[in-house]
UniProtKB/Swiss-Prot annotation:
Its cofactor is Mg(2+). Pathway: Cofactor biosynthesis; thiamine diphosphate biosynthesis; 4-methyl-5-(2-phosphoethyl)-thiazole from 5-(2-hydroxyethyl)-4-methylthiazole: step 1/1. This is Hydroxyethylthiazole kinase 1. Pfam families: HK. It comes from the Bacteria. The keyword Isomerase does not apply. Its EC number is 2.7.1.50. The keyword Magnesium applies.
Length: 263
């Protein structure tokens, strides 16, 4: 397996992460990227994104509050990413509830590129054509067959797929990881999943093995959450502590403290 200095390599490059994301968590995504050691750019005007992607290190597309203008921008950005060899992370927020989002994902796969799909277990199982339990943008799924769903979807789109829940699952279609770190408090603040998607974009920007980089991003969020909860047991203070601990997280810490089963 490739050397696992994922965070170190990311911080050495300070990658520019182009985010087309939702209005609910745009500030959270920008702040967590800064704390992690990346440089966020929240550029979504459809007449600007093609050029901006060309100078970016990774593109993060979050479908949470998808407008028609964002859809146009996301597709154009993905075309630029394909033309300029920029990795793309897709977060299919709420796709079981709004089928149009699946059409957007398929369009991006057709004309652009997808390197990572990161969603909750319900979203990933839905995209894989499996029965899933969701409510709005939240997953109610118990995680059964989640790794199989990741594997099927990874083969379909030829990309990395990550499904988050009580346990987190990652697959590239052949290899996989199961991550057992985290805290329930991450479900009590809006945007934890969106922030994780941004971290996935940061870690994949300059790291070839994207199964490892995605696993590292999830470990970073989960372990920062565990440490934040040790000092802050209420949602407001926990959110602040989470950002602080992302700032301090290291490769040594995530691989030593991480509870990961490689498949």
């Amino acid at each position: 397996m490739e050397n696992k200095n994922v965070i170190q390599k990311m911080r050495e490059k300070t990658p520019l992460i182009h985010c087309i994301t939702n209005y609910v968590t745009i500030n959270d995504c920008a702040n967590i990227l800064l704390s992690f050691g990346a440089s966020p750019a929240m550029c979504e005007a459809y007449d600007e994104v093609y050029d901006f992607v060309s100078i970016s290190s990774a593109l993060y597309i979050n479908l949470g509050t998808l407008t028609k203008e964002q859809e146009t921008a996301a597709v154009l950005a993905s075309i630029s990413a394909k033309n300029h060899n920029v990795p793309v992370v897709i977060d299919p927020v709420g796709c079981p509830a709004i089928k149009r989002k699946v059409e957007v994902i398929n369009r991006i796969a057709e004309v652009g590129r997808i390197d990572i799909i990161k969603g909750n277990i319900g979203e990933i199982k839905f995209l894989a054509g499996m029965d899933s339990e969701t409510r709005g943008v939240d997953s109610l799924d118990n995680g059964e067959n989640a790794l199989d769903a990741c594997t099927q979807l990874a083969k379909k789109y030829n990309c990395i797929v990550a499904a988050t829940g009580q346990k987190d699952f990652v697959s590239d279609g052949k290899r996989g990881s199961v991550i057992k770190n985290g805290t329930e408090m991450l479900t009590k603040v809006t945007g934890a999943g969106c922030m994780l998607g941004a971290l996935c974009a940061a870690t994949c920007a300059n790291f070839e093995d994207k199964l490892v980089s995605t696993t590292a991003a999830i470990l970073s969020m989960n372990i920062a959450g565990e440490k934040a909860y040790e000092k802050a047991q209420l949602p407001g203070s926990f959110r602040i502590a989470l950002i602080d601990n992302i700032y301090m997280i290291s490769d040594k810490e995530i691989w030593e403290r991480g509870n990961v089963e490689w498949k």
